[in-house]
Amino acid sequence: MEGMVVNTHSLRVVNARRTVVELILSDHPADCLSCSKSGNCELQKLAQKLGIREIHFKGEQSTYRKDDSPSIIRDVDKCIMCRRCETVCNQLQTVGALSAINRGFEAVVATAFEQDLVKSPCTMCGQCVMACPVGALSEVNQTRQVIQAISNPKKTVIVQTAPAVRVALGEEFGYPAGTIVTGKMAAALRRIGFDYVFDTDFAADLTIMEEGTELLDRISRYVKGDKDVKLPILTSCCPGWVNFFETNYPDMLDVPSTAKSPQQMFGAVAKNYWAEKLGIKREDMVVVSVMPCVAKKYECQRDEFKTDGNPDVDYSLTTRELAELIKQFNIDFTSLPEEDFDMPLGASTGAAVIFGATGGVIEAAARTAYEIFTGKTLDKVDFTELRGLEGVREATIDFDGTPIHLGIAHGLGNARKLLDSIRRGEANYHAIEVMACPGGCIGGAGQPYHHGDFSIVEKRHEAIYREDANKPLRKSHENPYIKQLYDEYFGKPCGEKSHHLLHTHYFDKSKQVEVEA
């Protein structure tokens, strides 16, 4: 109505706000000091903002059992029924693992028939954890196990860090979003007590050698008229994405690349090649990864990534857990010097760094595949047409007269669109990159909370490409230590030994989703 004045801060309105928040708090556990979201809890901040110092409402509180999966803990007692997790799971990711059930006081967000997450369609992508404003959803914390391993004199403990971690870790220590803290991170890891500080980027370069060779083999056979070849090839670096297609597209398990993720390739190299170099048994080595991801915790526990029950990667920490570990060791992060990774498994190229952003894996593959396919030097290594933050993108790269059609999707809802188009026979791609999280690994569920401010993800995105541009080598096949690894150990990409250690297979999980009425 014209001339109406709306007072949003009258005593009546302020009291109404306080009453609503007090009612929420009256049915909320008061364990803030030990809660995983302490300091990052939106309910806690709202209570502080409204000056709530006392809860005037008493009564029965909801009680539910905890649901512990390999990656995610659901502490439903802390659920405030905001339903953000349900929204992101159903609308953004199109997974449908979570929904509101029951009515009134018994209402809660849960899986179908209140099954455990591992018995649901959950992909462990963890975007529900990022969306949750309170401590109802959190990652499985493994810092204690890592500290115990470091303290064991009989164990050689090595650590690998993913590319997206270095552009986000600084946020936990007051640095602006997009600050690159690679050197300080390496220094902090040494002071924590890791015996070797390596870089997952090394394994990303290795992934390109394997995945790129596989891609070129499929394309070459297709060009020669082999109609049985499976195209497009799909990337396989993201465990949330792998879980998604194993559960939802079991008829397409022969389409994705068989190359393991960089995390798992690194673990296989560490516990075989590097353990032999050190002259120790794989059982005496502990491999820890630092990832922007919670699904990596699940990935390293998969049976196919173990040898006689011993995992290639023992523990996977999120970026948030690494920040917690640094603080536990009372390390002044901002005062640390810049240090390098240890060699040889710490050497990497710019192509490996861009794995951290959506479109980065396919661009890294294009840099190497072009030179191998054409036999010519690629002068312009920046395929800017593959970059961006649009949910679904496509581009055509000219391989010296041969057009290579590429697709990119980030977010599982966008991945579903591309996979459905492949099923219908409408897709005209040679290769597709998929990442489960918005923005790729930079927007992973293990990164510092951005509370819906996507500009933070955009700044991390910019930082990834700055780091790439500053690298002296920017093509994976130019990494001298990768060449050395093949000369000394694997022989050639996609050879017998590399196929045994660096490749995997997939499973039909559509029947593993248990529904018990």
What do the predicted segments below correspond to?
Residues 130:
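Conserved glycine-bearing catalytic or ligand-binding loops at nucleotide- and phosphate-handling centers
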